[in-house]
């Protein structure tokens, strides 16, 4: 069989396609991942063709049976991919024609690859997007469970990567719980853009058949029909919105991983990862490297790049379909797979790590973490104006630094030299690490009472996710 005969669009051409055309034009090496969606869409399309009298009942039965066989062949690796057939859509149609002859050639009636492909991608996003949503919910549940067990663990909270104030470890974990809730809602919003029927738009102007697009919408379980054939086949907004959601999620993932990398380092040391989630060095025997966190941090850049790739590609395209759009799937597939494995990796690290309270306490003391509490003590108890209190405590910290001491072991005479109020039990309570967190009584704060309150709200948030997958 000649190259010309193998091309399903070859009637207009007399010359065989060049090698470079086939090599640069093939996409089956990556778009084979759409085979399930392509077969799902083709079955729905065939049923619609039967509804409008293009196919008989017997022909529909043959097509459905053969498409099911092709799906099995693809899953078992029995269908050979050929560059001359370009993409997964042509492979499936070509194989269908091999199996049932002329009947198979009827399937593409009232359909273009333009509307076929964009519909496949929409179905793919809906399916994989829901799996990502499940993974986000699973990660949020892991954060919630660890937060429940970490309420009584006091760790440093950091600003500018310097010790700032004591917080309960649960407050830290819940901060990411709520960030991921926003990611969850972003994905729910983004998936709505794919919940639309583009199939039936043809190449771009519609088709010369009285197709039943409402029937197709119901067959594919979609909520709406694209009202304009040109927009339906050419828009990639559904991919953009999905990649925006992936990007925001991966930015959060990267920052979580940055925390894990820092907090597990010898310089911080407030958490430990088990050996099973770390690696060693080929030359330095002492090393224990947080490779999962580092790799996810690196992968976040790829997902950001995928979004940028699509943005730049789309901004210069004229209306409707252009072959450039073939490249959108590379960005999409890579982002989906990267997000999925990153969520799994972060969940395992969160469930695995253990806090190191003694290192946390040392960092808090050496970092003067209760300096703000001491200033507030002067304001509340001694009626000192806050700016004056701020200056007095700042002076006290400077004295501690000069003497290489902390707020806890600076001799009382040196404290009194700064302020007469820096004495006795009142002073000790003001700088106490164990009391500091419970002084943060504002809503959303890190006191134990507010943490218990926040955990209840978090649990309610998780319960609401049960309806996402009904």
UniProtKB/Swiss-Prot annotation:
Entry GO MF terms: argininosuccinate lyase activity
Pfam family, one: ASL_C2
Stated family: Belongs to the lyase 1 family. Argininosuccinate lyase subfamily.
CDD domains: Argininosuccinate_lyase (cd01359)
Keyword Disulfide bond in record: no
EC number per UniProt: 4.3.2.1
NCBIfam families in UniProt: argH
Name recorded for this polypeptide: Argininosuccinate lyase
Catalytic activities: 2-(N(omega)-L-arginino)succinate = fumarate + L-arginine
Pathway involvement of the protein, from the record: Amino-acid biosynthesis; L-arginine biosynthesis; L-arginine from L-ornithine and carbamoyl phosphate: step 3/3
Gene Ontology terms: biological process: arginine biosynthetic process via ornithine; L-arginine biosynthetic process
